[in-house]
Amino acid sequence: EDYGINIHDLEELESDAGLGNGGLGRLAACFMDSLASLDYPGHGNTIRYEYGLFKQKIENGYQVELPDQWMKTGFMWEVRKPKHRVPVKFFGKVIWDESEGKWKHVDAETIYAVPYDVPVIGNDTVNTNTLRLWSAEPSEDFPSNHDFQRYIEDVRSICQNLYPDDSTPAGKMLRLKQEYFFCSAGIQAIIKAHLRNYPSLDNFHEKHV
């Protein structure tokens, strides 16, 4: 008020984050909020969707659904952390490498999962947790037998819509790729964090829930 600015005018400029939508999304958001408010350490993982659920508009008495472009003006609470990116590999095959004595994933389509961290702050607590949003980005290791434009479209589609139409085989494949991308990135990050503090995974079950 000292500067002649109405806080309510500023509030209207910031879009609601397209997070915590849908039944499971709402439940997960409540878990994250409760963990922080009860002062328990905890971290969440999700996909950094370009579009949220949808925006509703009424025209001539009928509902009209519009894309929820919640990041069109940026999201000030997130911090991009490219050095913590992890590769997520689709398709290809797994073979045993005798020379290295381990299994290897070859001929795969690689997509990078880049994290954006958002703080989750509790009410009257000293604990701040993290919600990690994973964004799909193309890999420099592009397969020579793939169409580049199609590859870029496949990468972008992973983080484009929260609930893509899965009534077709292509839609079902996209939903599966979204789930695999999210799980692979999250698990890789957890394992890497563990190995920064401990020499092996022998005590992994004791440190993570």
Say what each PLM segment does.
Residues 1-209:
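A conserved ligand/cofactor-binding region detector
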